[in-house]
Amino acid sequence: MLGEQIAELKGKVIGQRVLDVEGPTMETSVSASGNVKGTQVNVSLTYVARPTSAGVLHGEGQGVIMAGESDMAAYTGEAVGRFSSSGVKWRGAIFYRTSSGGELASLNNVVELLEAEVDTEGNFSEKTWEWK
């Protein structure tokens, strides 16, 4: 069952590189900030995207969320991206893990569903909901 919205992030693509021209396969890195369960966070994420059919991408990524000076959580994710006139719209899932005892401790073993977009200017936005 889809639960409450957990996060809202905004950021910018900070780097891209071609991993393979057969396919092709692209790696994208994003720096973002926002709110996760009421806590202000900074996020660094990297994902690899490959085309699966005309106008559709398959992406796999990983990231780190930081809150305060030392509170951290890591995640992996997988999503399907579809090209639009404004960029690429992603839908997928994120899987968290952390040994944090701080504000991010409640993310441990949480699965989230995501809606994200990277526009043609490299702006990134994401909303996530807990999947219970």
Describe each model-derived feature in a short phrase.
Residues 1-132:
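Beta-strand-enriched cores of mature, soluble protein domains
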